[in-house]
């Protein structure tokens, strides 16, 4: 299985998700900024790309919604989960309009977040 790519400027969120997914034997690759993800996508072969992408919506140097748009241009079938501490309706609507698989408000319940990631992985495996 390809890694789950996690994008968040908050190191503690990345750490918690990495550890929780490692317990589920799900590989991860983490990024701090959206630009790192775009560069990695441009450099990655099909087998090196993400199984799914989990991204914060608001980060210094870029928006998760802008990243969603760029990722969907490159990998239209890739499930993308958008996380945000700003659980407002406008952000959720924008995420879904941009093609997000799901919207995860922070703070999140870790078991529910892991369950959502499993569902996204299953969806991506159906797309392959």
What do these predicted ranges mean?
Residues 32-33, 63-66:
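Acidic catalytic/metal-coordinating carboxylates
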Residues 25-40:
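Short hydrophobic/Thr-rich beta-strand motif most characteristic of the beta2 strand and flanking loop
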Residues 90, 104, 108-117:
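C-terminal output helix
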Residues 46-54:
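Active-site beta3 strand of CheY-like receiver
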Residues 14, 60, 84, 88:
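The feature encodes the CheY-like receiver
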Residues 2, 11-29:
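Two-component/phosphorelay signaling modules centered on CheY-like receiver
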Residues 39, 65-76, 94:
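Short amphipathic alpha-helix used as the core "switch/output" element in two-component signaling
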């Amino acid at each position: 299985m390809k890694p789950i790519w996690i994008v968040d400027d908050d190191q503690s969120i990345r750490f918690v998700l990495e550890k929780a997914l490692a317990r589920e034997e799900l590989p991860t690759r983490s990024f701090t900024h959206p630009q790192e993800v775009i560069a990695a996508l441009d450099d990655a072969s099909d087998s090196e790309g993400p199984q799914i992408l989990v991204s914060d919506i608001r980060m210094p140097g870029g928006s998760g919604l802008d990243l969603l748009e760029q990722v969907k241009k490159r990998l239209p079938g890739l499930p993308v989960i958008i996380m945000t501490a700003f659980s407002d309706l406008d952000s959720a609507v924008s995420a879904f309009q941009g093609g997000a698989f799901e919207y995860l408000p922070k703070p999140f319940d870790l078991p529910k977040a892991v369950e959502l990631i499993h569902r996204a992985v299953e969806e991506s495996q159906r797309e392959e």
